[in-house]
Amino acid sequence: MRIPAHQFFTHEEFQSRLDGVRSRMDERGLDALLLTTPENIYYLTGYQTPGYYYFIGLIVPLSGDPILIPPPHEESLVASYSVVEDYRLFADTESPLLGIASVLGELGLARSSIGVEYDSWFLKIREYMLLRSALPDARVHDGSGLVETGRLIKSEREIEYMRQAANIATAGVQSGLDAIAVGASE
């Protein structure tokens, strides 16, 4: 793992999260997992995207380093936020899913058991079909829930962030209540 410019969790925490996902992948007999949900990608990498309108992917092999597939115009954010060392960019004119199929082939996973987040709002049917046609010998399974299961159990750092957020929200609500008065504008 690399050290990004802005890191909100320790390397040990990211590694623990990755280990948990891999354990659940192994239980389901998956050799790789393709994540397309930005929150799940953030959970494993620290990578934050401002653009939910572009494809973002993360390939998590059962062994070996994960590979991030960010939009090309967000390359600078990889250095700023992601702990993942290996990332691949694909031009806006290319299909990132065909690129992902190529990377899976590079990793020797084109004929393996691959989990895909069927519940993701961020994988279009057309993209999924492109992936399937590019990997005709792969056994594709539902990988939904493998990350979310780990996200249910909060670390000490996550709990601390939640407490800080609650304190900020409480202060904001109190300020609003204090500002309420007859004739006051919004």
Please provide the spans of the model-predicted regions.
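A composition/biophysics-driven feature that prefers long, compositionally simple stretches
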Residues: 1-171
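Short regulatory/linker helices and ligand/cofactor-binding micro-motifs at input modules
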Residues: 176-180
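Short, intrinsically disordered, charge-balanced linker/junction segments flanking boundaries
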Residues: 183-186
